């Protein structure tokens, strides 16, 4: 894009006299990534203000600076002043990437719990149905079947546009993406339209960022308020915030409600059987909450025009998301406890998973729960997670999660405040030792839930990420137990 076209697209408040000749780009928001000819856009972040790095960007070779304030420089740089760079970055990133979002049918899934599983189920089902689909989410980033690293639930607008461009070039027709409340509040999903948007549920999470549950809900609603009349919203009306999400939106609304258009036919440790709009789905996924995930995935695929029976058949044969109620076992050993790894890191999610395991357990089968809470996040949920564990687990080991910059022992102390009694509660700060202890203590008949990190392959301590995977650690402990090592 040349400077003239850039200015015309932006429609700025002011521009400097200097206008560089020829093409400019790429677009960057981190001055450390600036190369010769870059367009640097200064974003006011929650911790860092990009306007502090205008001089650094120029020094590194930026030819265009986009900012929210008057800025003078002697350098041969075009300075473009706008009212709000955050609202501009999404549309501009799309424009400079060739508007890849316009060439994809985009499905957005938002909610506190179930985003990853629902989005993954839609991706897997559409792929099974023969569509060319890509996926962006917490666990996986997939361009068709190629897996890439996924760092955030929803990437920044520049990375998002670049990913979409790669997807289009690879032949993708659909993009299924998780949409976080942070991304919506920070306008990270601007510059393209959603074909279908889905709401799973809403409960306490991220209140360190949004401050109140009302602000958190309002951030989620941005996704639905932005839908066009030709788009569709799939909304879980069994959640107390379903009506709020649907209120006043322009799109068509497809409502999910168990007892109305969906039913749970059976729910056991072997899996689920549900009916949605008259179509039966038999899945290896377990738990009442997965009934909602399967039903929403079904309704999303139906909104995209697929045959109901074919959707049901596809969903009956897909595995779901890694680290979501994922079973860990040894191929050759059956005389070992059943180990489940799950990402549950909110009070609601932990309660749902434990309740599911409790409902499916047999007589004299104990449930061990290993969990912690993340540092530098909403501390109010820590004691609530303890209450959830106490209600459904027989033996509890409280440990570290991702303490980040916090002291893990202080996080554990916050959690302990939620226990009415600690008779069956042990604290072990080392997560590896906690997992080993649970597997050492459990009998072959018991169930062990390792909650909080799911698919993650790291543990963040003092701001650094160290290799750590609950599934690999559990497998190591199971191998030791199988050899009689405890």
Regions found by a protein language model. Give the residues of each.
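N-terminal leader/targeting and accessory segments in enzymes
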Residues: 1-91, 232, 282, 286-288, ...
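ATP-dependent carboxylate-amine ligase
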Residues: 1-15, 36-39, 52, 296-309, ...
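Phosphate-binding loop of NTP-binding sites
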Residues: 10-13, 89-237, 241-252, 301-302, ...
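Acidic, Mg2+-coordinating active-site environments of NTP-dependent enzymes
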Residues: 13, 68-76, 170, 185, ...
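Short acidic-hydrophobic, aromatic-tinged amphipathic segments that line or gate anion-handling sites
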Residues: 79-84, 257-258, 426-429, 434
């Amino acid at each position: 894009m040349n400077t003239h076209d850039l200015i015309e697209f932006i429609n700025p408040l002011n521009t400097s006299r200097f206008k560089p000749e020829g093409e400019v780009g790429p677009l960057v928001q981190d001055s450390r990534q600036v190369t010769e000819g870059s367009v640097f856009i200064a974003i006011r972040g929650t911790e860092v203000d990009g306007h502090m790095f205008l001089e650094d960007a120029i020094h590194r070779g930026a030819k265009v600076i986009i900012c929210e304030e008057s800025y003078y420089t002697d350098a041969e740089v075009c300075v473009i002043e706008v009212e709000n760079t955050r609202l501009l970055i999404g549309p501009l990133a799309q424009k400079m990437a060739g508007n890849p979002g316009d060439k994809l049918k985009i499905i957005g899934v938002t909610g506190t719990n179930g985003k990853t599983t629902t989005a993954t189920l839609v991706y897997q089902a559409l792929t099974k149905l023969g569509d060319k689909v890509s996926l962006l989410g917490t666990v996986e980033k997939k361009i068709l079947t190629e897996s890439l690293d996924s760092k955030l639930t929803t990437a920044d607008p520049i990375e998002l546009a670049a990913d979409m461009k790669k997807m289009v070039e690879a032949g993708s027709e659909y993009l299924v993406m998780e949409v976080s409340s942070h991304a919506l509040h920070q306008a990270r999903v601007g510059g393209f339209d959603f074909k279908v948007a889905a709401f799973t549920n809403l409960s306490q999470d991220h209140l360190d960022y949004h401050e109140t549950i009302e602000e958190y809900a309002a951030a989620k609603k941005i996704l639905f308020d932005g839908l066009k009349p030709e788009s569709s919203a799939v909304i879980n009306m069994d959640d107390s915030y379903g009506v709020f999400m649907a209120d006043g939106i322009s799109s068509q609304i497809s409502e999910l409600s168990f007892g109305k258009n969906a039913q749970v036919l059976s729910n056991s440790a072997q899996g689920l059987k549900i009916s949605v709009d008259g179509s039966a789905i038999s899945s290896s996924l377990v738990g009442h909450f997965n009934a909602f995930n399967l039903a929403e995935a079904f309704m999303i695929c139906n909104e995209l025009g697929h045959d109901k029976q074919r959707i049901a058949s596809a969903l009956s044969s897909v595995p779901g998301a890694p680290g979501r109620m994922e079973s860990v076992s040894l191929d050759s050993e059956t005389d070992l406890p059943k180990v489940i790894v799950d990402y549950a890191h909110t009070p609601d999610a932990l309660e749902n998973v434990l309740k599911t395991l409790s409902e499916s357990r047999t007589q004299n089968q104990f449930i061990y729960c290993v969990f912690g809470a993340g540092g530098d996040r909403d501390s109010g949920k820590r004691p609530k997670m303890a209450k959830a564990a106490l209600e459904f687990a027989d033996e509890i080991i409280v440990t570290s999660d991702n303490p980040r910059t916090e002291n893990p022992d202080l996080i554990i102390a916050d959690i302990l405040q939620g226990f009415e009694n600690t008779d069956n509660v042990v604290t072990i700060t080392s997560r590896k030792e906690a997992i080993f202890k649970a597997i050492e203590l459990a009998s072959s008949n018991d169930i062990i839930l390792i909650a909080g990190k799911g698919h993650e392959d790291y543990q963040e301590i003092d701001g650094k990420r160290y290799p750590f995977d609950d599934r690999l650690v559990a497998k190591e402990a199971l191998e030791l137990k199988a050899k009689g090592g405890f």
